[in-house]
């Protein structure tokens, strides 16, 4: 008797289009060339490469250029084909690429930092080159004259840099976990505010100028969405990685956030839902459910002749509870907890199946990601890994 085979439900996942291999060291940054089947990469092996797809279907370098120092970061402007490369020795080197992407012409060098350049950003509208370095300096230069316009000393080494052209606000995330917002003028800057939300260093920043929302990724494995435009101080946590978050990209047309981590995970978050802030954890000397004393509350332990318990916290209500009153686990996707977390028994009963419906999808890139670039027009994602490989993905099955 033949058994009926039930068709498997189709799982929507990114489609691997191409592996681009050949770098001797880690590719620190790379971008997809718009309107071309090409990739520009800068690597720790000191090379700048422009990879174009050949008739064979493989990507081969049309440009292979050796720099005097390892390449730490880059910024590419498609309109002018201007490529700004940050180097380990503190220099930013600028090139113009030819229309056919077969030649790069040196333009100028900026002696921007005393040590490794960590981030570089070319702003076409203002003709500015913004950068951060391991010397804890943020600097901006005029790309026309090459002159340094100003600088600001950050509290720690910066690892995230974003700029809003309309307001001239610059966002700097650093290794201490702090995010700093500066207002830039032509030759001076004003500190507007700084804030912290991560328990680890900030590893990535992403700015959405339409919703006026800043996303920060951290070595504490979390992503935080900061509502800058709302002016209410709202911060939404997203917990979906098992290792440090290395890169962020936002798809404005679908309101989806792509976060990638050292765990190889590509997480696509639906940001078109009404998310909730996680509550502050409350302090108490005894369980706020059963009133059992916690182990440091000697007086109540002595008076009630009870052994002190360890304190836990419910992730939904924030109350201090004992292990017995928080024995259950649940995901709370609208609070950013896509994995199961500790909740008190009463909150567990109150959470509905609708509230447990996931708001993110999880995918495995099969390499530890150090950098990503998203091409929204084609729906392609580039990931660069510690395995020295660049991968190109078609994200349209999951970003739509």
Curated annotation (Swiss-Prot):
Residues the record lists as binding Zn(2+) 2: 314, 317, 344, 347
Annotated GO CC locations: cytoplasm; early endosome; vesicle
Zinc finger regions, FYVE-type: 281-352
Compartment annotation: Endosome; Early endosome; Cytoplasm
UniProt-listed CDD domains: FYVE_WDFY1_like
SMART domains the UniProt entry points to: FYVE, WD40
Database matches in SUPFAM superfamilies: WD40 repeat-like
GO molecular function, one term: zinc ion binding
Induction details: Transiently up-regulated during adipogenesis (at protein level).
Tissue specificity of this protein: Highly expressed in the brain (at protein level).
Keywords: Cytoplasm, Endosome, Metal-binding, Repeat, WD repeat, Zinc, Zinc-finger
Positions contributing to Zn(2+) 1 binding: 287, 290, 322, 325
Gene Ontology biological process: positive regulation of fat cell differentiation; positive regulation of protein phosphorylation
Pfam family, one: FYVE
Positions annotated as WD repeat: 22-61, 66-105, 112-150, 153-192, 197-236, 240-279, 364-399
UniProt free text on domains: The FYVE-type zinc finger is essential for its vesicular localization.
Biological role: Acts in an adapter protein-like fashion to mediate the interaction between the kinase PRKCZ and its substrate VAMP2 and increases the PRKCZ-dependent phosphorylation of VAMP2. Positively regulates adipocyte differentiation, by facilitating the phosphorylation and thus inactivation of the anti-adipogenetic transcription factor FOXO1 by the kinase AKT1. Plays a role in endosomal control of AKT2 signaling; required for insulin-stimulated AKT2 phosphorylation and glucose uptake and insulin-stimulated phosphorylation of AKT2 substrates. Participates in transferrin receptor endocytosis.
Assembly behavior: Homodimer. Interacts (via WD repeats 1-3) with AKT1, AKT2, PRKCZ and PRKCI. Interacts with VAMP2. Forms a complex with VAMP2 and PRKCZ. Interacts with FOXO1. Forms a complex with AKT1 and FOXO1.
Protein name according to UniProt: WD repeat and FYVE domain-containing protein 2
Taxonomic classification: Eukaryota, Metazoa, Chordata, Craniata, Vertebrata
Encoding gene (name): Wdfy2
């Amino acid at each position: 008797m033949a058994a009926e085979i039930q068709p498997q439900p189709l799982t929507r996942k990114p489609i691997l289009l191409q592996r681009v291999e050949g770098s001797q060291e880690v590719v620190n940054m790379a971008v997809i060339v718009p309107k071309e089947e090409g990739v520009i990469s800068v690597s720790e092996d000191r090379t700048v490469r422009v990879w174009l797809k050949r008739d064979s279907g493989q990507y081969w370098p049309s440009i292979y250029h050796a720099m005097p120092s390892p390449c730490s970061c880059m910024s590419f402007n498609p309109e002018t084909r201007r490529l700004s490369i940050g180097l380990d020795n503190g220099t930013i080197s600028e090139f113009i690429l030819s229309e056919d992407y077969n030649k790069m012409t040196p333009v100028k060098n900026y002696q921007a930092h005393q040590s490794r350049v960590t981030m570089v950003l070319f702003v076409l509208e203002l003709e500015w080159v913004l950068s951060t370095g391991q010397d804890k300096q943020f600097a901006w230069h005029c790309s026309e004259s090459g002159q340094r316009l100003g600088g600001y000393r950050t509290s720690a080494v910066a690892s995230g840099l974003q700029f809003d052209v309309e307001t001239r606000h610059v966002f700097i995330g650093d290794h201490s976990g702090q995010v700093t917002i500066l207002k830039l003028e032509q030759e001076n800057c004003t500190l507007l505010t700084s804030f912290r939300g991560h328990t680890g260093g900030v590893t990535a920043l992403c700015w959405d100028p339409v919703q006026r929302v800043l996303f920060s990724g951290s070595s504490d494995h979390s992503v935080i969405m900061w509502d800058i435009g709302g002016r209410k101080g709202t911060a939404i946590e997203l917990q979906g990685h098992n290792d440090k978050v290395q890169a962020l990209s936002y798809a404005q047309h679908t309101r989806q956030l792509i976060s990638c981590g050292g765990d190889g995970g590509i997480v696509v978050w639906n940001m078109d839902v009404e998310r909730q802030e996680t509550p502050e954890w409350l302090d108490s000397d005894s369980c706020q459910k059963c009133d059992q004393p916690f182990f440091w509350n000697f007086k109540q332990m002595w008076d009630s002749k009870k052994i002190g318990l360890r304190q836990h916290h419910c992730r939904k209500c924030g109350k201090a509870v004992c292990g017995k009153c928080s024995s259950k686990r649940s995901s709370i996707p609208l609070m950013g907890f896509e994995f199961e977390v500790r909740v008190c028994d009463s909150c567990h009963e109150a959470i509905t199946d609708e509230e447990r419906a996931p708001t993110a999808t999880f995918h495995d890139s099969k390499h530890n990601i150090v950098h990503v670039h998203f091409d929204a027009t084609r729906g392609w994602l580039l990931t660069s890994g510690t395995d020295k490989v660049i991968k190109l993905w078609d994200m349209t099955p999951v970003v739509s």
